[in-house]
């Protein structure tokens, strides 16, 4: 774990981190390294959109608007937003491990960056499409 300096976060991993519980040991160590500015965690645009939709639907409580949540998150330079590209959309369209479009876009972002994905999503892990951390 100590040698990993950068990764991409899945939505549930970021929400577990924000809630202060529920992360696996590898994920917790990586988020702590980011908090200490010893690692970089990329946050795909698909994660921002999914969190915003979940908050609007009342499925999660960020205790503030999603915009403020992400503005606060990105004040730490170790958290970097990662833009969606058309190539990622095409790559995501070719992924068939589940029917969740957010998962496909997030995996495509991690693949584009050639970085591991912080996730415990069983479909993603089982797909072996990329290295995962939990």
Spell out what each predicted region is.
Residues 54:
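ABC-type ATPase nucleotide-binding domain
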Residues 34-37, 48, 68, 82, ...:
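Generic hydrophobic-segment detector
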Residues 1-43, 57-72, 113, 123, ...:
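Short, well-structured N-terminal submotif of metal-dependent ribonuclease cores
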Residues 51:
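Phosphate/NTP-binding elements of NTP-utilizing enzymes
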Residues 13, 47, 88, 106, ...:
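Alpha-helix capping/helix-boundary segments
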Residues 61-64, 75-120:
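Active-site neighborhoods of divalent-metal-dependent phosphate/nucleic-acid chemistry enzymes
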Residues 129-134:
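Active-site regions of enzymes building and remodeling cell-envelope glycoconjugates
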